[in-house]
Design a protein with these regions (language model features):
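Hydrophobic residues embedded in beta-strands of well-ordered beta-sheets
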Residues: 16, 37-39, 155, 162-163
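C-terminal regulatory/interaction regions
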Residues: 109-167
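Single conserved hydrophobic/aromatic residue that forms the stacking wall/gate
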Residues: 1-12
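Metallo-beta-lactamase
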Residues: 17-106
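Generic leucine side-chain signal with a strong bias for well-ordered alpha-helical environments
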Residues: 5, 67-70, 111, 146
Length: 167
């Protein structure tokens, strides 16, 4: 917890605004403390990293929408549930959105190149820039990206293999 929050006593009623931010989990909330213009982001946003979106409870479409929703609020900092305090909140939010969309495009391009492929082969191809020890966790995010691409009608799953619909 950042020094701005340590030792502070607050009456929660009417001072903290809950913001439903599904994506990491369906029941995830961020909390906005208007008085100090700080967003308590829980597991929604972290400094220097992205959070895991693990289906079935996590959903990439909802996650990206929730990130965009935060642009409608006014705050100067983010206190994440893990990691460092964030003093450039809207830059980090935009970076996170772009990172997710770029990863999604990488998934789609690999599918277009590889054709119908199982998730494990796709995982190695898409997350070739990730420490191999992290691949089991990356697989959850890959699955979330694939579900989003299916929801967006860009990919189909047939007989255990994913295929681009935009070949």
């Amino acid at each position: 917890i950042h020094h701005r929050l340590v030792g502070s006593e607050m009456c929660i009623r009417d001072r903290i605004k809950p913001i439903h931010t599904p994506g990491h989990a369906s029941n995830h909330y961020c909390f906005l403390i208007d008085e100090i213009k700080c967003l308590l982001s829980g597991d929604h946003i972290m400094d220097g990293s992205t959070v895991v979106i693990a289906p079935k409870d996590g959903n990439m479409n909802e996650y990206i929408s929730s990130l965009k929703k935060l642009n409608d609020f006014s705050f100067d900092s983010i206190a994440p549930g893990h990691g460092n305090f964030i003093d450039n909140p809207f830059e980090i939010i935009e970076w996170t959105i772009q990172h997710r969309l770029e990863r999604e495009e990488k998934v789609h391009k690999k599918l277009s190149k590889l054709g119908a492929v199982g998730i494990n082969r796709l995982l190695i191809s898409v997350y070739n820039d990730v420490n191999p020890k992290l691949l089991p966790i990356a697989k959850w995010s890959l699955e979330a990206h694939l579900i989003k691409l299916i929801e967006d009608e860009r990919v189909v799953l047939e007989k255990g293999k994913y295929r681009s619909l935009e070949d």
